[in-house]
């Protein structure tokens, strides 16, 4: 990840675009959180306890409750700006991906995330289960697992507490790591080794 970010920050220095800087800092936040938490999430899934999707969904539910949001009414994609301006901005650091494809990805992300919200008592999930039943129960379950459900689908309190502690660990790292990115947007330099992971750690 690190070498690619250095090139992206050079692009920010050249263009002096605040929107591009905001995107890169957001990308950095995503990287810090995932590279810290995914090793544990993947370990739990590999042990057959709880799937990656289900654990993250229940963690989302917990965080929504903690921050005063209703998991059955909250739309996580509300902050995504699916505009051509956003797509052109992202294209500056991902030049191999066409602006149109980035725009479509943003639109589809927003649409599908809204579909997964349980604002209808689970009706969309049930309809999806029925529509996907010809594909087999296992494949249908893989897709419908993404839908938020009215109630928690599994008792994973121990795993959620561990994930919460890992998120706190990521939050502690974030200020220094994001400062590294911000400095690169002003002058050339190098990122520390902690940027040399993948999103899976």
Annotated model-derived regions:
Residues 48-74:
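Post-HExxH zinc-binding segment in Zn-dependent metallohydrolases
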Residues 16-54:
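Active-site beta-strand/loop microenvironment that shapes enzyme catalytic pockets
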Residues 34-42, 64, 179, 183-186:
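Charged/polar positions within long, soluble alpha-helices
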Residues 15-16, 43-47, 69-107:
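Inter-helical turn/loop segments and adjacent helix faces that build the functional surface
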Residues 29-36, 67, 116, 120:
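Short alpha-helix boundary/capping elements
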Residues 92-164:
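An amphipathic alpha-helical core segment
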Residues 137-201:
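Acidic, carboxylate-rich catalytic segments that either coordinate divalent cations
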Residues 1-7, 11-12:
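Single conserved hydrophobic/aromatic residue that forms the stacking wall/gate
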């Amino acid at each position: 990840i690190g070498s690619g970010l250095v090139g992206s920050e050079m692009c920010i220095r050249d263009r002096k675009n605040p929107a591009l800087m905001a995107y890169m800092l957001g990308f950095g936040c995503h990287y810090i959180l995932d590279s810290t938490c995914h090793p544990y999430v993947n370990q739990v899934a590999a042990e057959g306890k709880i799937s990656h999707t289900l654990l993250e969904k229940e963690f989302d539910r917990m965080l929504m409750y903690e921050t005063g949001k209703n998991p059955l009414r909250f739309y996580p994609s509300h902050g995504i700006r699916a505009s051509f301006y956003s797509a052109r901005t992202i294209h500056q650091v991902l030049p191999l991906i066409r602006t149109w494809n980035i725009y479509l990805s943003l639109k589809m992300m927003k649409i599908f995330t809204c579909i997964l919200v349980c604002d209808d008592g689970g009706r969309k999930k049930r309809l999806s289960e029925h529509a996907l039943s010809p594909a087999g129960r296992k494949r249908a379950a893989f897709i419908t697992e993404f839908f938020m459900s009215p109630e928690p689908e599994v008792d994973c309190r121990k795993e959620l507490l561990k994930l919460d502690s890992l998120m706190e660990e990521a939050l502690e790292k974030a200020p220094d790591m994001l400062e590294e990115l911000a400095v690169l947007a002003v002058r050339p330099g190098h990122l520390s080794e902690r940027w040399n992971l993948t999103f899976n750690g």
